[in-house]
Swiss-Prot record:
InterPro entries: Ig-like_fold, Ig_E-set, Papain-like_cys_pep_sf, Transglutaminase, Transglutaminase-like, Transglutaminase-like_sf, Transglutaminase_animal, Transglutaminase_AS. Belongs to the transglutaminase superfamily. Transglutaminase family. Keywords: Acyltransferase, Calcium, Cytoplasm, Disease variant, Metal-binding, Neurodegeneration, Spinocerebellar ataxia, Transferase. It comes from Homo sapiens. Its cofactor is Ca(2+). Ca(2+) 2 binds at D303, D305, N307, S309, D327. The active site is at C274, H333, D356. GO terms for cellular component: cytoplasm. This is Protein-glutamine gamma-glutamyltransferase 6.
Length: 706
């Protein structure tokens, strides 16, 4: 009998794609998930004899070996699935054979080469069948990344767009983001990110063998999304100067960033800030099959010395002293959570894990963060891997402001144990709503349980019991002071103060506010009020001073007074950053030595609306109308709309906007032709050299073609 050979392979991409939830990947090769069988049909040179044997070989990575679990050799069997790779005959018709192949739920993920050996009466035929890609499988109960809820799998694995929350605690704004994990080349780029890592460059065989473990994979990608150590994807920039690159606020999604990294031969893409790093990390992990979401923390601590405190130093006008202040409190910070088991810690710590690709501090010599179990953070188990102290401080640190005197002494003028870690937010499953998940990270502020957890974290970090909220703090110059009573309430204040916004703060308009002071005593008091204001980045780093004035105020018994404040547009327009944020401070000096510091964050408003004029259907053009308003009291030209949306546009659109008169409202129409059904996010930005980008998005519900 003549030898047998394979003449053709049908990878059954449609059938396998539907079964594995991978039909959206546009790759030429098959994409499947581990721990689940997939089928392929072989056309043979003749009918297969019952005594003839099919032996399959799977290989991934360089120097693949069975010892490293990067190679598997197995033959068809009627037995039940074992722990390794298996193959079974599904159907046979003359010269056609359909086989079912299955990987173990702990298989290494990545690109595989599949080969077959047909043995017949001492005759052998070998053939490479081709390559396929194996991903993590949140649908497989035995996979470490298993997620039980189908609604959550749809949101956190398959949704290719989302919302990132930015702003300040009392003014949270939603920004659309195009994850685009199913766009052209994105899967290949995500696999390239793993292959470009230092671990792979140094020892590729060992690195690939570790890719069965989501803990390892997410930690590698957390480092590779930033460029600080490894020519990773995105280069950070927080100074407001973006020459030679793209402003972080100009990005509308991850696809353009990842494609630019590939086309630039892996040169870091300029520039990113926290939400950009988080958006890209979310794309990569969803693409590889790990359920991932973007999380925003408002009043987020950056505790450089891990003493669970943010110490801010100010002068007599309340201005931050940059040379003394090493810690910081960002208006918001954005990171990721991914869902998987912690085999290294135990089942109590399974579930959501914090990952942060923003390069803030080094972890084991590399700029990365996590995975840190959210449960471990809530319970104060900061000693557990990875980077628990840093994440715990981001949501739980104490906040103290010190007045720095000319004689280099300092005086505490403000302290708050509840200021850090507010309104921790993520997008709701299946809707655009904001969900507050603060209770996943910590017990209610001020509760007995919260105090116990804080004390536990201090003990884990410093090996001492905390009798109060605070154990030690860093002095300027690096010396430390042990204090258990540092955050005990100060003496009862004799005055109170707050800023009141008199008119909505609109971009392009003068700002009108008042400082409201109240005498809380039955005696008259004199107060010197030093006012300052500055444009700031979202990290609260000052950019330029726009207000500096002093007032002498006499307050009668129980009297209240207002100090009116006006900041003209001409004062701030040249120095306003794309964050559109201003910080006001009032240092109130009472005659008898008491100090009161009052601060106010202001975010300037803008306007854009987007309407889809009719039903949207795959393959049918539909008109979109965008209405914008020139926020300035001057004529502007050279404006454009930048439009992006996965499944709605093949590439970014740039649409010129006619010259806008002062505060003019104008509408622009354009057509889109959807290529995919379901809810799709269309992002539209008004871009101008005269003012920061004005961003908007709308969800377009696309019907299937009739």
């Amino acid at each position: 009998m003549a030898g047998i050979r394979v003449t053709k392979v049908d990878w059954q991409r449609s059938r396998n794609g539907a079964a594995h939830h991978t039909q959206e990947y546009p790759c030429p090769e098959l994409v499947v998930r581990r721990g689940q069988s997939f089928s392929l049909t072989l056309e043979l040179s003749r009918a297969l004899d019952c005594e003839e044997i099919l032996i399959f070989t799977m290989e991934t990575g360089p120097r693949a070996s069975e010892a490293l679990h990067t190679k598997a050799v197995f033959q068809t069997s009627e037995l039940e699935r074992g722990e390794g790779w298996t193959a079974a005959r599904e159907a046979q018709m003359e010269k056609t054979l359909t086989v079912s192949l299955a990987s173990p739920p702990s298989a290494v993920i990545g690109r595989y080469l599949l080969s077959i050996r047909l043995s017949s009466h001492r005759k052998h035929s070998n053939r490479r069948l081709g390559e396929f890609v194996l991903l993590f499988n949140p649908w497989c109960a035995e996979d470490d990344v298993f997620l039980a809820s189908e609604e959550e799998r749809q949101e956190y694995v398959l949704s290719d767009s989302g919302i990132i929350f930015r702003g300040v605690e009392k003014h949270i704004r939603a920004q659309g983001w195009n994850y685009g994990q199913f766009e052209e080349d994105i899967l290949n780029i995500c696999l390239s990110i793993l292959d470009r890592s230092p671990g792979h460059q140094n020892n590729p065989a060992t690195d690939v063998s570790c890719r069965h473990n989501p803990i390892y994979v997410t930690r590698v990608i957390s480092a590779m999304v930033n460029s600080n150590n490894d020519r990773g994807v995105v280069q950070g920039q927080w100074q407001g100067k973006y020459g030679g690159g793209t402003s972080p606020l100009h990005w509308r999604g991850s696809v353009a960033i990842l494609q630019k990294w590939l086309k630039g031969r892996y040169k870091p893409v300029k520039y990113g800030q926290c939400w950009v790093f988080a958006g890209v990390l979310c794309t990569v992990l969803r693409c590889l099959g790990i359920a991932t979401r973007v999380v925003s923390n408002f009043n987020s601590a950056h505790d450089t010395d891990q003493n669970l405190s943010v110490d801010k130093y100010v002068d007599s006008f309340g201005r931050t002293l940059e040379d003394l202040t090493e810690d910081s409190m960002w208006n918001f910070h954005v990171w990721n959570e991914s869902w998987f088991a912690r085999q290294d810690l135990g089942p109590s710590y399974n579930g959501w894990q914090v990952l942060d690709a923003t390069p803030q501090e080094e972890s084991e010599g590399v700029f990365r963060c996590g995975p840190a179990s959210v449960t471990a953070i809530r319970e104060g188990d900061v000693h557990l891997a990875h980077d628990g102290p840093f994440v715990f401080a981001e949501v739980n640190a104490d906040y103290i402001t010190w007045l720095w005197h000319e004689d280099e002494s300092r005086e505490r003028v403000y302290s708050n144990t509840k200021k850090i870690g507010r309104c921790i937010s993520t997008k709701a499953v299946g809707s655009d709503s904001r969900v507050d998940i603060t209770d996943l990270y910590k017990y209610p502020e001020g509760s007995r349980k919260e105090r116990q957890v804080y004390s536990k974290a201090v003990n884990r970090l410093f090996g001492v019991e905390a009798s109060g909220r605070r154990i030690w703090i860093r002095r300027a110059g690096g010396r430390c002071l042990w204090r258990d009573d540092l955050l005990e309430p100060a003496t009862k204040p004799s005055i109170a103060g707050k800023f009141k916004v008199l008119e909505p703060p609109m971009l392009g308009h003068d700002l009108r506010l008042a400082l409201c002071l109240a005498n809380l005593t039955s005696r008259a008091q004199r107060v010197r009020v030093n006012l300052s204001g500055a444009t700031i980045l979202y990290t609260r780093k000052p950019v330029a001073e726009i207000l500096h004035e002093s007032h002498a105020v006499r307050l009668g018994p129980q009297e209240e007074k207002r100090i009116p404040i006006t900041i003209s547009y001409s004062k701030y327009k040249e120095d306003l950053t794309e964050d559109k944020k201003i910080l006001l401070a009032a240092m109130c000096l009472v005659t008898k030595g008491e100090k009161l510091l009052v601060e106010k964050d202001i975010t300037l408003e803008d306007f854009i609306t987007i309407k889809v004029l009719g039903p949207a259907m795959v393959g049918v053009a539909v008109t979109v109308e965008v209405t914008v308003v020139n926020p300035l009291i001057e004529r502007v030209k050279d404006c454009a709309l930048m439009v992006e949306g996965s499944g709605l546009l093949q590439e970014q659109l740039s649409i010129d906007v006619p010259t806008l008169e002062p505060q003019e409202r104008a509408s622009v129409q354009f057509d889109i032709t959807p290529s995919k059904s379901g809810p799709r996010q269309l992002q539209v930005d008004l871009v101008s050299p005269h003012f920061p980008d004005i961003k908007g998005f709308v969800i377009v519900h696309v019907a299937t073609a009739k």
